[in-house]
Each structure stands twice: as C-alpha cells, then as structure tokens.
C-alpha cells in the first residue's frame, strides 16, 4: 500500500517512474493503502489505482479491493484494510470462503494496516477483530503489513511456548519514520531506516529475509518449516542479528518520550 504519496497527477508520475524498471521485469502485486484513497465521508479509491493495477477490475467483492492468487504451492490473499467497518465485514466473509477452500500448502495474507499495531494497542482494532481469528483458524503462515513506518516482527507461540506460524511483519520503505511502541509480543524492531523482505519457498520451508534497504544488509530472518501433517515450527535466525534503533532527537516532548521508550526497550533486551 501507499504506492503514491497522494492521488494526484504529479504523485502518480513519481510512482510510475519508480515502478518503471521493476514492472518491466517482475509482476507487481499490490494492496491498497490509505494514500491511494480520496478523503470523503465514505472513502473512495482514486480511479487510477484500479486502472494501473487492472486485476482489481476483475476482483471487486462488494466494492472491496480484494483478490487472491496462487503460485505453485503458495496462495496469497490481498485485503483492503482502509475501509469502514461494514466493508471489512464483507471482506471477512470473503477471506473465510477463500481460506476454507484453499488447498495451498503455504498461505500468505497481505494488508496495509497491521493487525497488531506498533503505534498503540487500540490501533487497527477493527482490522484485528475481523481478520486475525481467520489467520489463526485456517493456518496462515505469514502476514505482511505496512503503514506504520518502522520494522517489526511478531511470532506466534504454541501451548508449550514453541515458536510457530503465523509470523507477522510490519515494514516500510519510506524516508518517513514513526515513533513506535515496543510491544513485548514482538520479537524484533527496527527504526530510523527502510526495509524490504525477500520470501522464498523451497519444499517444506518458507524463508523470510528482511534487509535494510539503505545498505542491503540482512536485518532479520526466519524459516517456517512444515511437516507432512501441516504442523509448523519456526527457526529464528534473526535473533543473532543486532537490532538497530536509530533515532536523532531534536528535543521535542514526543521525541524525548520516544527516546525514553527506546532506552527502556534496550535495557529490557540487553542491547548496548
């Protein structure tokens, strides 16, 4: 989501230039972000988005921009988390239908707003209420999210505390960074930089590697390993990679509070 800063002619031209070399070599799979929407009482998607990414024209479900695609043994479910509650309810029914009939070994859900926010526990409550029970019920392996302009990864745990799917990631590639909360449920954070993920499936293993986009250095890495019964276990290779919490304060109250949260988190994790 948020492929364009604002749905205007100038901003769309910037988006086209940025996508030009990528779109000629790779298929571009998108979800809608809040910046693609026009701000009315009922939000309205700017018309050019569906014309550029024309698969949306074939996948309208109750005026929701949702679709699913399958690639080999992986199925991706793309949601529109920007909508009002009654539209999210329609998406919930669609997602359950799609997950219920899916026979894919690997399932990935993609949406703009994180189901577990790193900006505050009450943020995105409608999205979490609608979609997360389905993520857990139908064995989704990976949830890819954006919007909150930092990096974070949260891993589910079984009854005995063992790490397992689903894995939730929040990421962004914008020069703008947010003052986030360091929720104890998350395994890893990154602030003050940009990030991208590379996901590969090989046999019984799905690998997610996250990179710092400014250096292309590996920043986080997890392997989801699935047995023949569909039960998964997780290998956290990212815990051996140091966390980078970069922040330069100019002395404002919000900045001072964020610096305090960083210091408390570092103390909790034993980060120097």
Predicted regions and their residues:
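Active-site glycine-centered loops adjacent to acidic/histidine catalytic or metal-binding residues
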Residues: 1-2, 33-34, 79, 112, ...
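Short acidic, glycine-rich surface-loop motifs adjacent to enzyme active sites
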Residues: 1-3, 102-119
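Short active-site segment of divalent metal-dependent hydrolases/proteases
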Residues: 4-5, 36, 115, 150
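Extended active-site neighborhood of metal-dependent phosphoesterases/phosphodiesterases
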Residues: 9-103, 122, 130-131, 142, ...
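Histidine-centered catalytic micro-motifs
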Residues: 109-115, 141-151
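Outer-membrane beta-barrel translocator/channel fold
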Residues: 118-126
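Binuclear metal-dependent phosphoesterase catalytic core
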Residues: 160-250
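C-terminal luminal/periplasmic domains and tails of membrane-associated envelope-modifying transferases
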Residues: 246, 253, 257-272
